[in-house]
């Protein structure tokens, strides 16, 4: 895909960030179709359908909510992030070695690995990973998670807004994707942080 095509409408052009669009091969037996694709209705009878949203932040206004007293930001390593992701998402895993491979991405930036730590217990209670494609100035939110007992307390918004702040002046826009029907309502979180222009992409796997 050409840069100009992607930049004209990043959410509709691809379900993936630009750098992945041109480097990732869709596995055999899988299709990724946009919500307006006329093939969707027919294929839904023969394929398992998982819808994902893709949103964009125009980076014009970024909130900067303060951390509550007793909490601090820290830079986590892949082991800490792997353990936290596993604790937040029982059905998903990201091994330490898999996360370590992110350091090889052309979009890797160590300043965009972030965690919130409870200063009393030293426990990580929220974390996130973002990346930056300096070629087209696209920021990408890869992982954002909050420990179950700390949800609905604003920590997810703090993580997202802090990552956006660190991307400010370096990224012209930031994209994020997630499961549309996830019970933790990630789309609502991102929209509350200023993301917009949602497009649904359907990941279809042959049954």
Predicted regions and their residues:
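Conserved active-site tyrosine of GNAT-family acetyltransferases
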Residues: 19, 40-43, 186-191, 195
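Conserved acetyl-CoA-binding loop-helix of GNAT-fold acetyltransferases
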Residues: 143-148, 152-168, 187-192
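Conserved GNAT acetyl-CoA-binding A-motif
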Residues: 26-34, 167-179
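Short amphipathic alpha-helix that is part of the acyltransferase structural core
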Residues: 63-96
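Short glycine/proline-centered loop/turn elements that form peptide/ligand docking sites
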Residues: 160, 182-186, 207
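Acyl-donor-binding surface of acyltransferase catalytic domains
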Residues: 1-68, 202-206
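A short, internal acetyl-CoA/4′-phosphopantetheine-binding micro-motif in the GNAT/acyltransferase core
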Residues: 7-11, 144-152, 180
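A conserved beta-strand-loop-helix scaffold within acyl/acetyltransferase catalytic domains
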Residues: 93-146
């Amino acid at each position: 895909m050409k840069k100009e095509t992607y930049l004209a409408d990043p959410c509709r052009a691809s379900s993936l960030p630009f750098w992945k669009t041109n480097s990732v091969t869709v596995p055999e037996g899988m299709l990724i179709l946009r919500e307006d694709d006329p093939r969707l209705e027919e294929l839904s009878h023969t394929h398992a359908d998982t819808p994902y949203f893709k949103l964009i932040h125009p980076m014009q206004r970024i909130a900067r909510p303060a951390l509550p007293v007793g909490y601090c930001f820290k830079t986590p390593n892949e082991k800490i992030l792997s353990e936290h992701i596993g604790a937040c998402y029982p059905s998903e895993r990201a091994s330490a070695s898999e996360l370590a491979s992110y350091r090889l991405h052309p979009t890797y930036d160590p300043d965009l690995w972030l965690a919130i730590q409870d200063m009393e217990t030293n426990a990580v209670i929220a974390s996130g990973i973002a990346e930056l494609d300096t070629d087209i100035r696209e920021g990408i939110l890869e992982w954002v998670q909050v420990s179950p007992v700390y949800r609905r307390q604003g920590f997810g918004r703090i993580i997202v807004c802090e990552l956006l702040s660190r991307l400010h002046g370096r990224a012209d826009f930031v994209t994020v994707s997630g499961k549309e029907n996830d019970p933790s309502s990630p789309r609502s979180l991102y929209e509350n942080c200023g993301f917009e222009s949602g497009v649904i992409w359907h990941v279809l796997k042959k049954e």
